[in-house]
């Protein structure tokens, strides 16, 4: 006794006025009416198609999982943003098409009639032959659309994973070209489910004609047209290798290229040389050749091969940067930390001044930092190299680039190719408080002597190599005859310490005002510089620091 018969019998009993049947139905009356209204909003063919799809769950085997079809090396090569999209219902496979969908075609009309009856749309449904043909056409179109979209979503969700090292990528490439061949497996399962089979040559003309007319063959032929570009990659033609074979050959070249770097005595040095050759000399290499090939391939193979190429470039750059980091730490970061970082002006609270010799060696043009930049980092930064991992992160970190820009400002302010270390500036007297009659500003032996009267400007330099000893001092002499009072500093950075002891105001491009308060009096100067950045503000130095890592 079928469920459908029970439903029909219960309906007949209610129609005949059976009180027991009516009372048992009453609790379901409103929910059923509500469900009928909601379902009736959907097109009839969509309702019937969903019913057919639901029934398939009870008669077809378990869903097809692309992860299982690709095999045990899936995670070594692929990644998936949404594993649910890797699951294909058996209803939408070759097996489901041949063993279920095409065999339900005669029942589609009956399902449509039942749908109308269940929704109480009509008491008696009769369909003409034209109606039957239209029902079959609509449901077939829905099936083809669903089938195509599901397989496209599954293949689109198969992406090449990220690789952290050359060793990881070479291992994956070995699986791709000679191991489990996960790329070919993925394309093969797609082809097997979207392409009609090849007829035996033993078939007679009549048998072939009958086979061509079979519903499953016609549906698979339509699907074959939808996925023709993808399936063409596996097609073998006479006297011509398949697209997949050509891809394998190119990936083999890429694998050899990476393996040569990996097996070099110093892999990082070899990787750095490879990057320099490719960028500095526009050298063509297997990475370039593979990327060019990827552009000619159909999806999804173009995406997969392109991604393998991007990852190859990524791991080579990472290897090169890691190699550079060792030299960076030893040749750049170590001398900076040992000789400059903890001393004034880089540490404004330090009582110890940084050596001018150490400062010059480190920051001058072609000095320690500039030489490392020119020989190693410039190529990466000028070419704006990124990791190609979806986030478009640059290979050399942004904070490192920012510090290099700060170093260039220091170089521009304090160094010239003609004179080496040194900067020139002008000090203009502005005002002296009324309780003081004279001020004397001594900057490394360069005097700016001012008494109440007309203002003037003195041109000065730092450091003052014409005088031994480094003392900078401001002295104010009062009107009452008391002893002069001063603030003073000594050392190679004494000028900077003295300006730092004043109150900086009115800071603009090329000039700033500084006010000194001494013994109840005050003297104000305006300092003019040749550069937009104020060399005496201290910010350039105190904000400068170097990380041990570049990447």
Where are these regions (language model features)?
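C-terminal domain/tail detector
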Residues: 1-551
